[in-house]
UniProtKB/Swiss-Prot annotation:
Record-listed Mg(2+) 2 binding positions: 312, 314
Keyword list, A-Z: Antibiotic biosynthesis, ATP-binding, Ligase, Magnesium, Manganese, Metal-binding, Nucleotide-binding
Protein name: [Butirosin acyl-carrier protein]--L-glutamate ligase
Pathway participation: Antibiotic biosynthesis; butirosin biosynthesis
Binding site for Mg(2+) 1: 298, 312
Catalytic activity: holo-[BtrI ACP] + L-glutamate + ATP = gamma-L-glutamyl-[BtrI ACP] + ADP + phosphate; 4-aminobutanoyl-[BtrI ACP] + L-glutamate + ATP = 4-(gamma-L-glutamylamino)butanoyl-[BtrI ACP] + ADP + phosphate + H(+)
GO molecular function: acid-thiol ligase activity; ATP binding; metal ion binding
Segments crossing the lipid bilayer: none
Cofactor(s) of this protein: Mg(2+); Mn(2+)
Residue ranges constituting the ATP-grasp domain according to the UniProt record: 144-345
Amino acid sequence: MKFTHPLDYYRLNGKQILWYMNIGEDQDSQASNYFPSVKDPQSEKIVVQQEQQLLFLARPQDTVFFHTMPEQAFLDYWKERRLSLPSIICCDKLSQVPDLERYTIIPFIVSDQLLELKRRYPHMDIIAPDLAVCREINHKFNTRRLMERNGFNVTTGYFCSDIESLEHAYEQLISAGFSKCVLKVPYGSSGKGLKVIDNERNFRFLLNYIQNRQTNVDLLLEGWHPHRLSLTSQLFITEYEVHLLAVTEQIIDPNGVYKGTNFTPALSQSEAADYREEILRAGELIRQMGYRGVLGIDSILDTNGELIPVIEINARLTQVTYILPLVIEQKKRYEFVESRVLVFNSRADLDFEDYENDLSEVTRDLPVRIDLYNFCKASGAFKNTYKLFVLVSAHNSEQLIKARSLLDELNTKMTTAVH
C-alpha cells in the first residue's frame, strides 16, 4: 500500500487548511489536585507564542491562526531564508475567524473546547483523532498496564490507592536501590502531572500535601532510571499502517530542565533496530485502539543499556512535529542537527532584530548554521521574559559543542543586559 505523507493525509477532503496551535488546552488533567503549583502569567503568554512554529509545517497554500502576530522582522528573516510563508490570520479567538466553516482545522490537540466550537459551526471540519481514544492513550496508568500485558519492558513502579500504599511503595523502591523516584498522576504531558522526588524530606512534604488535600488517592510511584538517552519517537498512524517519522533525543540538564532536541541521537545499529521494532509494535497496539494521526512516544535507554520503550504517550502533534520539514532540509547538508531552547529574564526590552544581531555577532566565526525559529517575549513590571528556539546544524560534534557554549554565554549576557 502506498504511503500517504501526513501533510497529504490532512488534505484529503480538499478544503482550505487552517493550522491552529491550541497548546494551552488540555484533553484532561488532574495534576493540580495533587501537586503544589503556581500560575505564572508571563509563562502563559510565552506558551501561546510558540504557535510561530506552525509556519514550518504549513504549506504556502495553507492558512495559520495566530493569537499574537509575530514581529515583521521575524517574518522577513524567514523570507530571506527562502521559506514560503502561508497566509496568516490573527485574532483573539478562533471563533472570530471570518467564514470559519470554509476551513479544515488541524489543531495541536483535540479538546472539549474545540469540539464545542464544532457544534457551533457544524460545517467546519476538524482533522484530529477521536477525543475518547486520546484520553485512553494519554492515561499514563492505562498505558503502563497495556504495555505490561503485551510484554514490553516498563519501569519499576507501584500503583497506590491510599497514603499507606504510597509510603510502602517508596520504601520498596529505596530498598531496591533507587536514589530518586517519580510520582505520577494519570494525566499530564510535558512534565505536568509528575514530581521527581530526590530525598525523603521531599517525599514527606509531598505526602503531607496530598494527605491534606485528597480523600481519594490514585497515583503511580516509579523508580528513577538513570538515563543514557531520553528518546522520543514521532509516529504517523493510519487506518491500516504505522509509520515511524522520526526518532529524537530530548536534551535534559542535571536539574531535569528541557534544553532542546537532538535530531541525530547516538544509537548503535542494534539499538536503533531494537528501538524501531518496539516502537512500531507499540504503534500497532495504538492503531488497534482506533487512533489516527501523528503522536509522540517518550522512551528511555538507561545507563545499563536497558530500553524502556514507552514511558509516556502524547496523543497529539508535538512541537518536534512542526519543525520536522526544517530539520529534514538541514540533515541533507549537515551531520548533526539539534534544537536549543534559550530562556532568560532581563530588564532589557529586546525585539527580534536586537537578539538576532547579537546571535549573529556571537556565532559569526563558527562554521555552523543557526536558525532562530521561535521568538517569544512577555513583558512584566520589573523584567521581561524571553524564550527562544534555535536550530543548530553542524558538520561535526566539536562544532556543535562550541555552538552550545556560545549560546549559553549569550544567554548569560542577555540576562544581565540593560540595552
